[in-house]
Structure formats: C-alpha cells, structure tokens
Amino acid sequence: MQRKIVLVNQHSGYLFLDVVNAFAKEYDQVVLMAGKVVTMDDPLDPKVTVQKIFPYNRASTFKRFMSWIVCVVNIWWLLLTKYRQHDLLLSSNPPVASTLIPLLFRRRTSLLLYDVYPDGLVATGFVGVKNPIFKVWAWFNKCAYRKVDRIITLTDGMATTIQQYCPKEKITVVPAWSNVPTVEHSATKEENPFVEAYGLQNKWIVMYSGNFGKGYHLEPLVKVAENFRGYPDIVFILVGEGWQKELLSSRIESHGLSNCKILPYQPSAFFLHSLQACHVGVVSLTESLENVAIPSKTYNLLAVGHPIFCIGSVTSALARFLEKHEVGMTCDPTDTESMTRFIERLYVDKEYYRRLSDNALIVAKSHTKHRARDILELVAAGAQNRP
C-alpha cells in the first residue's frame, strides 16, 4: 500500500521544508500545500509536488485574518477533491487550519504547532480570555485535538499551553534547528562578501537581523550603541524592515551614531555570510513569545559559534536556554546598563567570549536537521498505531 501525505504550511520556511524533504525520502507521494515557499541552500526534493494555496497577507490585521480564512477554504476544497487518500501534517500556519481541518475530515492527521492559538491572540492583547472569539476557538481546539493522532511542538512552554486542549500523552516536543552548517566563528572573516559589501573590515560587529515590528525591543540596542562611541572598531548593525525602521533611523541620525547602521534584508546568497560576519548575535523577544517559543534564528547563530544577546524577559524560555547552556545573556529592555556591560565584557574578555562561542558550537550540534527525521518518525508511528 502506498504511503501518501499532504503537508500544509501557508508560508513555508526552512524548518518546514526540511520536514517535507524528510518525508520525501520515506513516503511514496508527498504534497506540500503552501502559499509561499522560501528556500535557502537546500532545495525541495524533486519528488515533492507543490500545491499552491492562498498566500499569507500581513499588510493589516484584517487582511491577515482574511488570508487565513480564505486559505482554509482553499485547503478544504483541495483535500475534498484532489487529495482524498492522503494523510495530513498540518502546521499552525494558517492557525485556523490546525483547528478546523481535523474536524472536517476523517483521516490520519498530525499537527506541527509553531504557535498556539487562540492563546497567541491573548498574549498580543488582541482579545481577552473572556472574549467569545477566545472561548469558541478554545472549544474547537478541544474537539479537533481529540481527533488527531499526534501533536508536535517546539518548546516545553508551548507543550504546557497545549495541554489545556488535549492529554499530554499526545504531545511531543521537538526543538527547532539550524539551517546552516556548524562552522567556527572566524572561518570566513577575512574574505567575507557581506563584510566587503558594507565596508565592515576590521570591525567587531553586534548584529540584529529580522523583523522591525512593533513588539520587538530594538530601540534599546540603539541606546546601547551610544555608550560605545569611544570604541571605533565596535559597530551595531540592524538588518531588516518593519514598522520601527523610521523611528530607529531617526534616532540614529539625531544622535549622530556613526557606529550604528540599518541595512535592508539581505539576499539569500548573503545569509550565511552575514551570520558569520558578526561577533554577537542579537535576538529580541516579543511579549507573545516570551514563555512559549525560542526564535529559530537562535539556532543559526549558535551554529556559527556566536554568543547571543537577548533583549526581552529574563524569565523567558530563551533566557533559561541561554543560561542553561552558557551561550549568552538576556537583559530586560529597560536595563541598558546591563546590556552595555555584557557587550563590553564580550569585547574585552577574550577567554569569556571563547567559552561562550565554544559552548554555542556544542549546543548547535544537537540541533541539526536530524530533528526533521524525528518529526517524520512521530507522524509515521501515529499513523501505524491508528486502527
């Protein structure tokens, strides 16, 4: 009997594509339903069929929700008419798919939850726990999660949140992983295309790369840059786009900070080079992620041997992770004095920097693409155990 599976992710990045490729090695037919596929160095296995679905639209809250709803209808119709005999692995993108689709079909279904909804709406202040949207969505979760074979998530905090909807025996934690090879921190410093493109030769680089959205604590990083005016070789680089860009640019300009630069998102060919170029990687946590998620960029920074500087809650899942493995430090967004001391210590104390860097490489070796294989095995086992 042929094994067929449909994997669904409205906006598929490297973590999900690694999972898809793992299934392609074992299953007879593999279909990826995605509105957008973002590949890095590893292309999709040619065996995989890509089925386009309605793309994610983050232009506004209304458009975001509408793109979720339209996408779920799109998925439902395709499963009803074109992929009637396939097992399912549904991600939480779009969020309503992992709640509604299991209720609409009787077939082997597993969930891969990167986010937990409706709890994420509460964390961002969009609704309260007494709001009818929260109550109805939570009730549907309990009905849907009762029907699925396996729920896979990324952190213990997320697993704890999911337990309100189903027995903990159904839930397995598989941590995220890096998309880059584990390499020594200084492996390509001398002739790095990213360094050459932006004139960063002989600079000691503190870098944030990602979303400049409202919930990210990036202004404190610019404030810290002000404290390093007397260090001509230390620079602060912010790579990305988003709502805060104009605010950050204005502060940099008004304070005459020649040691702080904003760069646009880099082409994929520069991704690994930009990671290797910096000396300290910055991660900012939004309040909605503090207790449930560890951003995937964390693992990429570890893979190139960088100490990590987190701006966010000192009691977050990431803060505990950094402290446990001694690979970095978390500072409250208001504590720019501690931020300054930490960066200065990394710069001055070479032995301390090397210890954190070596620890990062050790941790990275346990967070590689073999985790995608773990997800494959969990889904396959769940399918075999279903009567």
Label each region the model flagged:
Residues 1-45, 228, 387:
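N-terminal subdomain of nucleotide-sugar transferases
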Residues 14, 70-75, 80, 87-120:
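An aromatic- and histidine-rich active-site surface loop
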Residues 104, 131-153:
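Membrane-proximal helix-turn-helix segments that form the acceptor-binding/catalytic region
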Residues 157, 174-177:
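Carbohydrate-associated surface elements
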Residues 195, 199-216, 222-225, 237, ...:
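Conserved donor-binding/catalytic core segment of Leloir-type glycosyltransferases
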Residues 216, 267-274, 281-302, 307-320:
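Nucleotide-sugar-dependent
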